[in-house]
């Protein structure tokens, strides 16, 4: 019985560590600007981009290995991005060139 309890306890601890591993971040787009210019996250963390603006945005990164594109993001929509490797993603808006963000992704 004690072996079974030990295995169950170990499983619960490992599950908690796994679930606690990724963090969630929120970045707001408003007034044709972005709420931060730079952020540091870890691999597998999630960034949710919220369009709290009155205009459409189009965020993307062409950084090798960290590419993504949130095509047309109308006002009120949220989209989440997750990076699977370390590096520095240069994020831009295809519609508003003044929107720039550096995402530093650590291992």
Where are these regions (language model features)?
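Domain-edge interaction signal
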Residues: 10-12
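Extracytoplasmic copper-binding redox domains, predominantly the cupredoxin/blue-copper superfamily
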Residues: 2-3, 7, 16-107
